[in-house]
Amino acid sequence: MTSNKALETLLEMCEESNASDLHLAVGLPPRFRIKGSLVPRDDLRAFDAADVEAVAMELGRAAVPLGGDEGVERVREVLLREKSIDGAVTSSSGVRYRFNVYRASDACAVALRRLDSRFRSFAELGVPERIEAFSDERDGLFIVTGPTGSGKSTTLATMIDIINHKRDGHIITIEDPIEYIHKSDRCVVHQREVGRDAKGFNEALVEALRQDPDVILVGEVRELETMRTALRAAETGHLVFTTLHAGDCVGAIERLIAVFPPDEQNSARRQLSLVLRGVTAQHLLPREDGGRVPACELLVNTMASANHIATGHSAQIYSVIETGGNNGMVTLDQSLERLVRSGAVSLRTALGIARYPPQLKQRLGVV
C-alpha cells in the first residue's frame, strides 16, 4: 500500500468511527480517540518504523511542499533539525485534519486531530453564548485560553465565521497551520499560514496593519514583539482575537503581562486594561455519557476589572467574575457546578480542575 493510500485509509477510519484524534507509534496499531478514550482497532496490525515514517513523510510534504523524492528528503531534513512539524491536510471526503509529526524514542510518531467540517453555533459548542457579543466589537482584544486540545481554535473559528456572515469588513487570520477554511461572505477573508504565506507571527501582524484590516486573528501570541504589535493593533481601531495557554482568565492576563520586561509591565497593564474586551478559559472534560463537554470561564472587561488589571490587583479580578453574572460572566467553578448538577460530568472530574474544590463541594452539598 502506498503512503498516500495508507494515510487516506486511516483518515477514512477516523471518519467512520467518529474519532477526534489518531495516533501512530512504532510497535503499536493505530489508536483512535473515540468519546475521549484512546483505543486500538482490532482489524489493524502494529505499525513498524517504516509504516509510521511513510505516513509521517506524506503528512510532512503537506507542510514542506516539494514534490517527489526531493520532498521526502526535505521533510527528513526539517524533522531532524526542528524535531517536529505542524501542518494540516484535507481528506478525499473534504474533512480537514491538523497534524503534528514528531520524533520520539529516535523514531517518527504522528498525532492527528479531526476538525469540524462545519461551523457550529456557540450554543452547540457548549460555550457561553455571551461570547458572541464580542463579534460586535469594533476594536480591542479578545483572548481565548486553555490547555492544548481544549477547543480554543474551534471557538475562534466560530467567532470569525459569525463576523464573516453578519458584517462588512476585511478579516486577516495568521495561523500555524490554517485549521478551518473561511470563504469570503460579507467580509473579505485572507488566511495567512506562517511558513507558507508569512515569515512569522509578528512579521505577518506588522504587515496586516498595512493591509486595511477590520478584524485580525493571531493563532497564538508567543513572543514579546508579537504581543506589543497585537496590543498596538487593538488600540488603533482593530478587533484582535488570539489564544494563550493558561488555566483561567486571571492566569491568561498574568501570562500576557509576564511576557514584558519588568520595567515595562506597569505600562503594559495600563494598555491592556484599556484594550481588553474579554477573556474566556476553556477545558474539555469527559462526559458521563461519553464524549466531551466544555467547562468555560468568562471575563467581560468592566470598569472594575480594568482597574484591577491596571493596578496589578489581579487576584481581585476573580471576584469580579464571580459576581458578574448579570454581565454574562461565569467562573470556572460556577461552570463546573452546573455541569455536575446537570449530570454531564462527575464530581470527581470537576474537583480535578476546580479552583476551589472545598467550596465547590460545599455548594453541591457534598460532605
Per-segment meaning from a language model:
Residues M1-V367:
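Short, flexible helix-loop junctions that flank or precede catalytic/ligand sites
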